[in-house]
């Protein structure tokens, strides 16, 4: 099997660039002029967990004992099997949408 070294270097560079941009956006979301609604925060949470932890690896919490934890679990579970690069891109897109909505 042959690999094109230039293609591999380009992919690594793009991945590093995406990771760096994602990390910047995780900080940027903390500096928004107002707190996003719960629905948007949960969506961002799901993407974030998928990037750093992969597929949801915990059992479903009982909503009766903790609705907040159950909603967070559902948000993460809803992006199960999503590629981490796609999750990073969706996170970045969502933060950009939030920024635009505050203008």
Could you say what each language-model-derived stretch is?
Residues 2, 8-103:
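N-terminal alpha-helical modules
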